[in-house]
UniProtKB/Swiss-Prot annotation:
Gene3D superfamilies, per the entry: 3.30.230.10, 3.40.50.670, Histidine kinase-like ATPase, C-terminal domain
Function: Topoisomerase IV is essential for chromosome segregation. It relaxes supercoiled DNA. Performs the decatenation events required during the replication of a circular DNA molecule.
Family designation: Belongs to the type II topoisomerase family.
Species assigned in the record: Borreliella burgdorferi (strain ATCC 35210 / DSM 4680 / CIP 102532 / B31)
Gene Ontology molecular functions: ATP binding; DNA binding; DNA topoisomerase type II (double strand cut, ATP-hydrolyzing) activity; metal ion binding
Listed name of the protein: DNA topoisomerase 4 subunit B
Coiled-coil ranges per UniProt: none
Top class in the EC scheme: isomerase
Domain of life: Bacteria
Enzyme Commission (EC) number: 5.6.2.2
Amino acid sequence: MKTQNYDESKIITLSSLEHIRLRSGMYIGRLGDGSNIDDGIYVLIKEIIDNSIDEFIMGYGNEIFIKKENNLISIRDYGRGIPLGKVIESVSVINTGAKYNDDVFQFSVGLNGVGTKAVNALSSKFLVRSTRNGKSFEALFSKGKLLESREIKSSDKDGTYVEFLADSEIFGKYSYSEDFLKRRFFHYACLNKGLIINYNDQIFESKNGLLDFLNSEIKSDDLLYDIVYYSSKTLEFAFSHTNNYGETYFSFVNGQYTNDGGTHQTGFREGFVRAINDFLKKTYSSTDIREGLVATLSVKIKDPIFESQTKNKLGNIETRGNVAKEVQKIISEILYKDKILAKLIEKKVVDNERLRKELSSVRKEARERAKKISFKIPKLKDCKFHFNDSSKQSEQTMIFLTEGDSATGSMVSCRDVYTQAIFSLRGKPQNMFEKNKSEIYKNEELYNMMVALGIEESIENLRYNKVVIATDADFDGFHIRNLLLTFFLTFFEDLILNGHMYILETPLFRVRNKKITTYCYSEEEKQKAILELKGGCEVTRFKGLGEISPNEFKGFIDINSIKLTKVDLFNIKEIKEKLGFYMGQNTPERRNFIMENLI
């Protein structure tokens, strides 16, 4: 299709704040409605709090007061305050700030001069007030545009106050989750010992840093030994082993949670293995040493380089070696001092090695069996690009885990063959709760799915950025969804912890007349559509994905319109108990729950 009238009039120039409003995803990631912890409204809060914490790190102000009234957020710190003559520029002009100067800020996340400006641009109301030496300067903005400003005398303590209301024109209907906010504030407190966060009169404070953090994430009964903890000015970590599968990490850079890891996390993993092997004077495999390891890590570095604006993965090359060297040294010293701890870790490593060798024969049989069937993975319709290659499209790659040939057929014919793969399940997968990992290799379908994802050894080889469960919106579909989540939570929980697991949202209803067709994802949306079409309309209830035609399905899985719900783990210590209740033995408690909630 040819583009008509491409001339000078088609070239437009946007101001920095206009660009933020038009392309908000470049600055805050997804928009969302507040139902997901990664939604943009939480990023707005984070950007302001980051500035307050930067003040605390530099030794100015150990309290941050945060209030939420409906959706109006206010944040007050007692740092140095923004220089009064630069308040307006500091919150409205891109690339303006003091964090380019090491004398003022040494360990900061917000080094790009964008964060606060993005909050300003994306808020219908944005008020900033800076107080220094008995004077205050305040400025009021709306959607990034200055409405008024003034300088006044003040008896308040030095510091900065920010109040904002996220713009409903950008975010639509949204609300903040109290659980998400409190979880984040607790993390801030653990990452900054001595910092007090007062949120609506609830205090968040940590005396033991990441030790408190890891204790909140793991049940003490699951620990094979007491949590090992270390802290210095630029490196802090805590770890222990459990009997769970895989490795679990919570890593941070200058207070920023890096759920995709990065060079600091790689350095920790390498240093940990070297320390154990050096102490034991053996050459155990890294898998045997780290299987079941749960660790949290925080580093403070100058000029952090992240792989995106949302700062999920650290890219500083030199950090890997520096962290590995220090971790190896510290853990070696700890092992030499604590012989009981050393024996417990050695026992875990030896047990891991034994189990791996026992598993190897089962693996070999499964691979030989798979070779006889096909050189390709059965039931996999693969895509051209993958997450573990170096293509520009790697971030867009996804695999749909669906059930039945009819649903698969609709999706195959309308998918993007470059970035969207499909793995078709044959009925309900096996319930893997409390099963041994060897059971995967005895189950052809689960084995093929694991190989298709590339996660047999670890999720470092994950072939798709998003693993999307796409099942029917009925009880059977929900059951299959739960069985798949049980499988991943049991053997590959880090796949979910690192934000790769999603649920495909497909419409429940189609409401249409001769001119308009509306797809509805809830009973509420259906009733609204019926009212808008004013009678005489046809209502179709989709019982299964196979009932949706390929032409319709194309709109539901198109990269620009797909609706995905991210699977979040709020607290890993609750996983075993929750899975036991829903997927374990049919206890009287579960029967009562079903009677009270489903019948």
